[in-house]
Each structure stands twice: as structure tokens, then as C-alpha cells.
């Protein structure tokens, strides 16, 4: 079928990261080792070496794309119609060639955004990226409170992030902040918004955890209660009104509390594409781990234009012809596109099913059962599993579980 021109490319240039966030959307099978919050160092001692960059389900044995390969991908994306590129990971600053990739994006006339934890982004690197043409930075924070933030990240990172935010502003680069919201930090939403004001962010995303990758593994610990979600929504709405014209605030609800599915990335293969560290091209960043039965083409063997227009993986759920009932007869089908394919796969083991978040899905009971379990256990302390990294030096030594 015919395809729209893509609007944005997410360039996951590495899955290496100095942090260990338990809600990371990266694949969980890069390493088989696990580490609980009660002993985060145990997992680090068995963390994967830097070369272990291919997940168990991958169809190739390649390592990360080279500088030259990424530069070619960027040129092909621009030729395909892409207007914006996000450099993500993992932690994209783990790649020393990041300024070269940003420069390639500028030469291709793409708007570039760095999605980062900020670790490693000192004043020298900030200015190098600015001079290469970087347009904006999205800086992640785990909380406004340093102790809580460092426990969530599994690393001493919060104080460094504050310095990074100041460096970004001083360099004249547009700054947005991203707070990933979950049960352990959602009650500090007012303080997070206050921190964004202090740091001078122009945009703030208050994003409830979406349950893929490590977040799916830790769902029972991370999913907030309905009372927490409703209270947070009211706080975010009030802040959006109060700060109108100064800070753009976006509050992203957790899917499970919705009754209709989100139009995930404006539909499968419609406007967005992701290239992961080893060169697989995905309709969304979680597709290869959530739907392993699909074969995803690689930029080392096919050009981006062919993959976007012709590949089986991009066409499998593009449009509406693939839809089962009740989606096929739904008047919303060209608005929500049946919801999220990865969520359908994770919850029902069939990516072609209606997203079970939808109130009309025959599988909505799965989501309702998850919510019942969350509310029945909301007063109990749980440990989570930290994300394990392909390369994971860290000085974090806390051994206390979060209550």
C-alpha cells in the first residue's frame, strides 16, 4: 500500500547507558543478569561487556552502526522526507562521534533533538554539540529530590543533571525536561514542576510510564493508583494554566487508565520510524522486542526508502485493512488505528488484536485485572529490577529498598 512520508526519525545510536532506570523501554534481553533494588551492585558485577550489543532475538550479529553508516542513514532519512531527528539511546553521549552525527543532521537540514540523561554532557561537549548544529535538548530527571532520583536511576546523577541544565541554557540551546512518572515519584509532581521553573525549561513532559521493556517487567511496582493519577492530572492541568506562555506542559496519562487506546505514533508506519543501534529499522522503538516474530530489515542490507515503503514489517499493520473486529467496524479506526501493536502483543500475545486498553476489546479484562492487583497491593513495599546495561560503570552504592 502507499505510505505517507515519515515526519521524524528516532536514532537510537547506542543502548549503553550509565543509568539503570527500572522503567527503561530498551529491550530486557541484552543481558540475562538481573539486579534488584535491594542489591543493585549485584547486577553491575555481572553486567554485559560493551560488545554485547545484540539482543537474543536479533536477526544479525552486528555491533553498533559506525559513524559513516549513521551519516548515510541520516542522508537517506532526509531524502525520504524526514524533517526531525532525535538522538536517543541508551545514552547517546556514550558515542564520542555524536557531534559528527549532529553535524550530518544539520547538513541534511533536519531539526535535531538530543534525548539524554545528561551524564557526560559537560560544558565543552555542550558547546561542541551547539557548534555542530544541535537545536534542542530533552533532559531527563527521575525526581526533584536528589536521594529519590538517585535511587530510581541506580546512580549518583541528580546533582550533575542540575549542572547540565545550566550548561545547556548558557549555551543558548532550547531546553525541555522529561519527568517519567510512576508510583514512587508521582506524589512529588508539584515539586518537579517547581524544579522545571527554576531551571528555566521551555517545555516539560510529565510522562507516566508506558509499559514496555524494563517497565513491563516492573509494572507491579511502577503503576500508580487511580487516585494518584487523578490527583496528578489535576496538578498538571492547574500548572499548565498558571504557566501558559512561559512553559509548555504536557501530561501523558498511563494507558491502562484510559478507555480508548492511544493513536500510537499516529499509526504503525505512518509518520515515524526508529533505527536501533545495530541498524534494524522499526515502526516504533519497542517493536523488535515486543513482536519478535516480525522480521525487521537492516540498513546494512537495504536502504531506508525501500524499508519504509516495501518491507513486510512496516506494511504489516499499516492502514486499516489488517484490523480485526471490533476495530474494523469502529468509526475511530482511522483516529486511533486500533491502538498500540506492541501493547497488544505484550498483553495478549498477538500483535493483531485490538489494544486491550480499549473498552470494546475482548481482552479488556486483562487490563482490569492488572489494575485490581495494583490497588490491592498499593500499601505493600516491593523491589524492582534495575535495567542492566551493555556497559555499566557506576558508583551508586545504596542498598535500601524503596518503600
Where are these regions (language model features)?
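Conserved alpha-helical substructure of the radical SAM core
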Residues: 1-136
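Short hydrophobic/aromatic beta-strand element in the GNAT-like acyltransferase core
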Residues: 10, 272, 327
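Processing junctions and N-termini across compartments
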Residues: 11, 15-18, 42, 321-324, ...
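Short cysteine clusters
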Residues: 17, 21-24, 264, 279, ...
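Iron-sulfur (Fe-S) cluster-binding segments and ferredoxin-like electron-carrier domains
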Residues: 26-32, 58-59, 288-294, 333-371
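Radical SAM enzyme [4Fe-4S]-AdoMet core and its adjacent flexible, acidic
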Residues: 30-40, 51-60, 65, 111, ...
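Short Fe-S-cluster ligation motifs
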Residues: 69-88, 313, 355-403
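C-terminal accessory region of radical SAM enzymes
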Residues: 225-257, 286-332, 336-337, 347, ...
